[in-house]
Amino acid sequence: MTRLYKTTNGIDYIEHLNHIRPPGDKSNEHAMFFGIDATAHMLLRRDNPSSPTRSQALLGTALPPYQDWEWRRLNVRIGGPSIIQIAPNKVIACIRRYGNGNWTELGWIDIKKASYEPAIRLPSGGDTSYAGLVWRDMKLWISYYSSHEGKTSIYLSKAIIE
């Protein structure tokens, strides 16, 4: 279950919304960001082995006060999502992909079209996921773990985004 909390002092929190995810959906991991216009965006992993389309990620959007969410299906199955907005209309996701093995990948999210476009496959494989993203000085720093070199290790990558 995903909940939103609010605070006025950074110490005491109260529940704002009890259940964001679509009712009855087999969703679990998520990542979110707030756009410069205060719109909330959430990238949501779903698992439903009986239906390929019901395993595709969802992109959720809500305006303040974040009570009503619109959910649209993305064209990709994901794991361990991380998402960051680096400029207006420039949203990058780092996800675990499934296919012929697992790998960690950077890609572009088009918020308006609710679509995902792969950009680069990071050195990864096996047990890999859960990236952290930092945008600083026009560079994207990515930390993630992977077991593609045998023992599971943590990796740090830097990407120049044009």
Q: Where does each model-flagged region fall?
A:
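Beta-rich carbohydrate-recognition and catalytic domains
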Residues: 1-80, 84-126, 135-162
